[in-house]
Amino acid sequence: MTRGVPGTHDIDLMLKFFKKIKSKKFRSLEVPKFNKAMDDRCKKSLWYKLKFRPDVVIFEGWCVGAKPQTAKQLKKPINSLEKVYDQGLKWRTHVNNQLKTKYKTLFNQLDGLLYLKAKNFNLLRNWRLKQERKLW
């Protein structure tokens, strides 16, 4: 199971969502439902149907609010995967460019950002494994 890194999301769809819920002419809206086991959206008949504008939207994701790195920061691999498989910086540069452009536009739609910090990486790993076991 993977996690979608910047550059793998439908930013245009998310921007349309925020535009519609902020519109004074809001009527109704279909919101995609994502199936993590399939790593894709559910069929449209299973999407959520909003009949009223929500008072609050919780926009959740591991990379929400992530900032791009500087060119200097980008050159230093942060893990063995980057060190071994991205020596030419192709992947890191692509993700970073996404954060500088489309994702910046998306994150500017947010009124606030709440960050939950786990005590350690093993706890995150255990939460993820527990979640993924439920998918299968």
List each model region and its residues:
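Acidic active-site catalytic centers that drive phospho-/nucleotidyl reactions
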Residues: 10, 60, 111
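Conserved RecA-like P-loop NTPase ATPase core
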Residues: 14, 58, 114
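Conserved nucleotide-sensing/catalytic segment adjacent to the nucleotide-binding pocket
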Residues: 1-39
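Conserved NTP phosphate-binding and transfer environment spanning the P-loop NTPase/kinase superfamily
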Residues: 63-136
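Glycine-rich phosphate/ribose-binding loops and adjacent secondary-structure elements
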Residues: 44-51
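Short gly/ser/thr-rich secondary-structure transition/capping motifs
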Residues: 36-43, 93-99
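Loop/turn-to-beta-strand initiation segments
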Residues: 26-28, 53-57, 112
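Switch II (G3) loop of P-loop NTPases
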Residues: 57-63
